[in-house]
Amino acid sequence: VDDTSTPVRAILADQGTHHAHLELLDNLHAAGWLAALSRPVPGSALADADQEAAMLLIRAHATGRPLLPETQPDPLETLLETDEARAAARTLLGPLAGNDSTSRTLRTTLRAWLAHHGSWDRTAADLGAHRNSVRYRISRIERDLGIDLSDPEQRMRMWFALSRFPDDTPTHPTQRDISR
């Protein structure tokens, strides 16, 4: 595998423990990979496992850390089916849901800004941008979406949308993806 941002999918015949999987994910993350693992499944359910890993990877991008499926189902996750969550995310993101470079840049900026709890400096450092560029992008997002990101409910709604938006852009330029 090279250093491109091309996602890698792998099937692994594995009976590892939850702790062993966490250690594997942490080691991959330390090497610059962002990974997510599905639950173990029989061969007949590989498509479902791939979808689960892909959704976890979307959430991993939003949080900036690798993810495993929860041992207990998240009650909030059960409220929305995957297709419904994606549709809701697309609606909430409105013009930011586009596939053009401006939309991707604004989503990446918003994701980093929310992950850094609104810190202009940490977001700018993470993105390799000037803090005033981050401020401009966030104000543009607020204007384009008609929201006020000083409102915690709006920040929560944007985090929900970004964590469920099918976007495969790494959160860091050197970060690589791996899902299985």
UniProtKB/Swiss-Prot annotation:
Looking up Pfam families in the UniProt record yields:
HTH_30
Protein family membership: Belongs to the CdaR family.
Q: Which PANTHER family match?
A: CARBOHYDRATE DIACID REGULATOR (PTHR33744), DNA-BINDING TRANSCRIPTIONAL ACTIVATOR ADER (PTHR33744:SF1)
- This protein is called Uncharacterized protein in pkwA 5'region
Q: Which organism is it from?
A: Thermomonospora curvata
